[in-house]
Amino acid sequence: YDSSFLGIGYYGWQITRNFAREQSNYYLTANDSASLSKIFTTISENIGSANIDLGSETVIKDIVTPYFTVPQDAGAIRLSTATYNGSAFGAPVAADPSVTAAIDPATRAVNVTGFDFNQNYVTTNAKADGTYGKKLIIEFDVSVEAGFLGGNQVPTNDGQSGIYAKGTMIKAFDVPTQDVEVKSITPTADDKTIYLGDSANLQELVHQNATFNGTNNAFVDVTYTVKDENGGTVGTYTVPAGSSSGTWAWSDAASGGTVAPEQTTTYTVTCTVSPTQSGTYESVSKDATFTITVNTCSLTISKAVTGDGANPNQTFVFNVMKGDDLVTTVVLKAGASTTITGLAVGDYTVVEDTAWSWSYTADKDGKADVTLSSTTPNGEAGITNTYVKHDWLTSIVDVINKWTAKDNIDNTGHVPGSGTN
């Protein structure tokens, strides 16, 4: 410091630097008004009085997140206090009856009032009455909400939980988290029977077997994977965490999930629930199988022959066509029939080879149209032929050659010679 002469017989002192304190509570300086306000707050904390007005009307608000249950009865809220002795808290005892709890179902909040923080604030220095204050303990039990699929690092308290004075938050509580067991989902799927050539949509057959609302699946991704008998992935349905629905992705994007197997095929659908955060619990999966049974159609071809003199051993040739494609060729005798199996649905035409059986006239121009479908899987085609008699010259036919000479003499049986007509 420096001394300076203020007047006759008077001396004053001027501060040239602050004292370098080694601990708190003794010497504080301020450079501006904000620092000055902080000084008085610090002094208040150290001389043993509350620096914020938190009387018995103060509200302690604990808002439970929607992933856990809220107590239905305020009587389930356990209220107690523990007295501080300057170094540790004593055993909890029941709180004064003036401290009460209430539940607000609309906001899922547990509200506690009646504890006077001004009177009971905790300090390391004894107060004027020799006490060190006490803390308020609020306890209640919660359980996982029904339908919640779990996950890691799930918050138990809403971020608006804290201490409120006159409706204003004074201090927010820390937000603790809890790892919650990840629940599995067992999918289901319908079996289906189709006919060869028909199709089935896998999206219509697979059932999620769960409802997602964005809250019950807030911390897990859910994926349904459909595979064929060879283990190849046909499609996946994914519901991202926090979403109420998902999207299908197919290995054959143009198919839209439609398949047309040529033989009976069994598929597997697996539902995997995966936590989005690291922690105690990992992904869980459940699967189910379903079968698309493929039946085939049949076509019966019959031959009838009319007309006297028909050859009982005459054969008739038929070509079975599907569009421009030859399906098969069959040969029948009169009065016989045959059944072609393993056919797909569609339009067929049975065409008789009339050149083969040229001496027989076929009705309907030798054609018969048949449509096979899931409602009429077994079709029939009949063609009737009529025998037409033809008289033909053969090597055994006798011919009489009759001619007359110029002299009008009948020369039947004689070889003509010179001088004849």
Give each language-model segment a name:
Residues Y1:
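Venus flytrap/periplasmic-binding-protein-like
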Residues S4-Y10, Q14, N18-N421:
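Solvent-exposed loop/turn and edge beta-strand elements of beta-rich ligand-binding domains
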